């Protein structure tokens, strides 16, 4: 893992241009209706189908202007036999990030009364390579963070219709993914206060990840709280990913990732702590990583710099493949996941490492 100062990056475009609440019932949630606008441009109408007003954080969801994963894309091998096996998911090439769990700004919150809706248009070619064209099936489901008193207090489920479109590959290639538009020139390492803070965070991440890996190998109450299953295979999977994170965090001149001290690509929205571009194994910290987070938390399940760095490392497939997603932010949402989703959730590892470190 190499860490880089902001001045060392030339990011340019290529010439191509209180009590936890868990709303999880079949009659309550958000319904997403997907439709095609033009080729790879998609419109989503998000409606509150429940009987009460809800407020949620729309970061990493529809209405987020950054290239986040709003939908899943699939190819059918019967129609595209050379490129994929049956119903293969198209690789996501956008960004993933960790957000603050409290002190949330109005700018990242959406409130919907019963029956109310909002629209969002986005281009799926910015987060997936669709240059080969052909039929693509699109759908979306998951949960979005429920917010009360400006803090994440649970989750709201959402689901969509299934939409199949015919993609013009030549047109899609003109859009290009986020990763394809990034050129990097590495000139020097992080320096100053931010460089020192990141070095400390990396050292702490090594310690936390190693402790958590050892604890995961043994299982126990904290393990089942986050990962539900105490089987040897689950313990081995968690331990292996955490060991890989420790190894990567301890390698500041090599490894698989490049770590930037500041927002190199311009995706640090309000309340975003750090982000990862998995297709490039690139990680970048945002300003509030330094201004809002302590080096290490002294309270169970609070956020800090070390676990935020650990969170981002789990997103990077170069550290441990496949990289994780963001399926549940914060303790309430993370501990409500089943085993499969917990193993694929970045915050589950970060929160578990915090729990082991503090003896929660």
From Swiss-Prot:
Entry keyword Mitochondrion: no
Alphabetized GO MF terms: metal ion binding; metalloendopeptidase activity
Keywords annotated in UniProt: Cleavage on pair of basic residues, Disulfide bond, Glycoprotein, Hydrolase, Metal-binding, Metalloprotease, Protease, Secreted, Signal, Zinc, Zymogen
Coiled coil (UniProt feature): none
Co-factor binding details: Binds 1 zinc ion per subunit.
Keyword Metal-binding among record annotations: yes
Catalytic residues (UniProt): 312
Protein function: Secreted metalloproteinase that allows assimilation of proteinaceous substrates. Shows high activities on basic nuclear substrates such as histone and protamine.
Family from the record: Belongs to the peptidase M35 family.
UniProt-recorded name of the protein: Neutral protease 2 homolog AN3393
């Amino acid at each position: 893992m190499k860490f880089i100062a902001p001045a060392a990056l030339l990011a340019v475009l290529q010439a191509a241009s209180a009590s936890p609440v868990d709303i999880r019932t079949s009659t309550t949630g958000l319904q997403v209706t997907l439709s095609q606008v033009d080729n790879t441009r998609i419109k989503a109408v998000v409606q509150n189908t429940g009987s009460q007003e809800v407020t949620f954080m729309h970061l990493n969801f529809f209405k987020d202007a950054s290239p986040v994963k709003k939908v899943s894309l699939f190819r059918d091998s019967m129609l595209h036999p050379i490129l994929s096996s049956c119903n293969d998911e198209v690789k996501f090439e956008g960004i993933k990030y960790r957000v603050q769990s409290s002190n949330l700004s109005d700018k990242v919150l959406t409130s919907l009364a019963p029956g109310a809706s909002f629209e969002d248009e986005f281009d799926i070619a910015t987060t997936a390579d669709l240059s080969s064209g052909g039929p693509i099936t699109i759908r979306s489901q998951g949960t979005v963070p429920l917010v009360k008193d400006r803090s994440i207090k649970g989750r709201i489920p959402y689901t969509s219709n299934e939409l199949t479109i015919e993609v013009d590959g030549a047109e899609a290639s003109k859009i290009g993914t986020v990763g394809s538009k990034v050129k990097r020139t590495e000139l020097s390492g992080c320096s100053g206060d931010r460089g020192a803070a990141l070095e400390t965070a990396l050292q702490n991440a090594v310690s936390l990840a190693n402790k958590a890996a050892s604890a995961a190998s043994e299982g126990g109450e904290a393990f089942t709280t986050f990962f539900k299953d105490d089987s040897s295979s689950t313990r081995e999977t968690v331990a292996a990913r955490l060991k890989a994170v420790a190894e990567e965090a301890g390698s500041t001149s090599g490894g698989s990732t490049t770590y930037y001290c500041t927002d190199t690509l311009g995706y640090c929205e309000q309340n975003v702590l750090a982000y990862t571009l998995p297709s490039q194994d690139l990680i970048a910290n945002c300003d509030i990583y330094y201004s809002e987070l302590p080096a290490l938390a002294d309270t169970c399940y609070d956020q800090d710099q070390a676990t935020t760095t650990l969170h981002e490392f789990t997103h990077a497939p170069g550290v441990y493949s496949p990289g994780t997603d963001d399926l549940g932010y914060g303790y309430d949402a993370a501990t409500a996941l089943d085993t499969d989703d917990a193993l694929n959730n970045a915050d589950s590892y970060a929160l578990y490492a915090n729990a082991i470190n503090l003896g929660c």
